[in-house]
Each structure stands twice: as C-alpha cells, then as structure tokens.
C-alpha cells in the first residue's frame, strides 16, 4: 500500500510515507482519465488500483492499495498525479487523477477511507467538552474559604529579628 501526499516531489516518495497540505492539493473534485500508458501492451488488461483518500488539518493523503507491487512509477505534476505499477499476478495497475477537473461521476476505484475519517465539525464540540471538563476541575480544586490571615508570621519574624539584635 502506498500513501502519497499531493504536494511532494518525486524525490520524497517512499513506500508508506505521506506528505502534503490541503491548501496545496487544489482539488475541485478528483477526476480520472484512462489514457493509454506508453509502455502498456494491448495483450495485458490494465486495471485501476483501489485508491483511498483522507485529510487532516495540514495534510491530504492518497493511498493506492496494491500488495506485492513491482515496477512502481509515480508522476506528480501541478495538475495531476499518475500512479502505475504491477501487482503480484503481473497485472498492470494505472491511476491518473487530474486536479481542477469537473467530474460528472465518481470513479468506482476511488473511495473515502472512513477508518481515518474525522468530522471537523464534531471536533469543535469535542474541544468545547474538554474546556468544560477543565472548568469543572478548576471549580473542584479551588477553595471557597478566604486565605489565612498570616498575621502570626509577621509577629514571629519581627520578634526573631529583635532577639538577635539585642
């Protein structure tokens, strides 16, 4: 499984590594294009790799789900990302996702990774619950009595100073 961010250079691509920021993603909606890959033969059928995406506050992740992949090629450009490889059976997998493209329908091989999904609106409610929890803790910890007068401390220190000076 490969997880690729959409603002990294090919020099930064490593198996299982992720980079990217949502503001760099620039996707209106993902689109797919099944253009013929230059090295593909007519005898072998090409398929799309199952692709998952999810986002975080600073990153957008794309995972191309392929086990035992070989001949992995990733092309990242300003307007698209192209992923191709061969699986263990020798079947060529090819995905091309263009950015800023208008999409009429969602490709069947692209789906949301709900295991990593976060509801950003729900996070605000959760943070508010944490703030309320801390406010309750502070109420429990705070004392409702007035602080001690400490008049005795001043008297003792003065008498101790007087005794040493005599």
Swiss-Prot record:
One of its GO terms (biological process) is protein folding. Residues 46-154 form the CS domain. GO terms for molecular function: Hsp90 protein binding; protein-folding chaperone binding. Residues 142-166 are annotated as: Disordered. Residues 151-166 have a biased composition (Acidic residues). One of its GO terms (cellular component) is nucleus. InterPro entries: CS_dom (IPR007052), HSP20-like_chaperone (IPR008978), p23-like (IPR045250). It comes from the Eukaryota. Signal peptide: none annotated. PANTHER family: PROTEIN PTGES3L-RELATED, TELOMERASE-BINDING PROTEIN P23 HSP90 CO-CHAPERONE. Belongs to the p23/wos2 family. This is Putative protein PTGES3L. It comes from Homo sapiens (Human). The gene is PTGES3L.
């Amino acid at each position: 499984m490969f997880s690729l961010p959409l603002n990294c250079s090919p020099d930064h691509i490593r198996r299982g590594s992720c980079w990217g920021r949502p503001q760099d993603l620039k996707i209106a909606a993902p689109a797919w294009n099944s253009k013929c890959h230059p090295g593909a033969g007519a005898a072998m059928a090409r398929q799309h790799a199952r692709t998952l995406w999810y986002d975080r506050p600073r990153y957008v992740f794309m995972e191309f789900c392929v086990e035992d992949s070989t001949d992995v090629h990733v092309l990242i450009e300003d307007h698209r990302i192209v992923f191709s490889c061969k699986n263990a059976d020798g079947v060529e997998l090819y995905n091309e996702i263009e950015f800023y493209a208008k999409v009429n329908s969602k490709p069947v091989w692209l789906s949301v990774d709900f295991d990593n999904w976060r509801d950003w609106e729900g996070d605000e409610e959760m943070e508010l619950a944490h703030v309320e929890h801390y406010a309750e803790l502070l109420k429990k910890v705070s004392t409702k009595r007035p602080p001690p007068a400490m008049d005795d401390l001043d008297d003792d220190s003065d008498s101790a100073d007087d005794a040493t000076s005599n």
